[in-house]
């Protein structure tokens, strides 16, 4: 029995040495094993713009106001008619498309891409303040977790100023890639931006 135990003790250090050597050999470099080939290191601005444009009809066709006024009602999801709206309906406005547009505005490849994104951002903010009134605007999308709420009148003033600057930014030589609405036509985006300015001005005149 003693001979067997001595042999086991002699083999144990060799086994441990082999284990640690093997771990050290393979722990520092796993190659591409844990690398996700579907993740990009930098944003694809054309994809961000396309994604934003696809989401725009959801803002344009909001039914919340009609439900509040009882122009029509729901059967399956009656939260809005019962004035019991999930918080995500508000917060989701800031966590999705607006972030994509802000990314293009901050890091986009040219002024035309940035100008279009500013117009779309202004449009979305107009629908947000029309739905909720006073909301975060001037401090939104800046990484501030507790942005101040701006008065709706100040938001409208800011949107008109932003749209003027956005339309003036358009007109360079940079391509508007990912544009599934106007196919990169700068003149049409300028018309849309100016039309949106007129719409907001009409709304202000009624207050």
Where are these regions (language model features)?
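Sec-dependent bacterial lipoprotein signal peptides
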Residues: 1-22
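Aromatic-residue-lined binding/catalytic grooves and analogous aromatic/hydrophobic interfacial grooves
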Residues: 23-28, 157-173, 186-207
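Membrane-proximal, proline-rich intrinsically disordered regions
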Residues: 23-95, 103, 107, 111
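Conserved, well-structured interaction surfaces
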Residues: 72-178
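A glycine-rich, coil/turn loop motif that links secondary-structure elements
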Residues: 115, 179-191
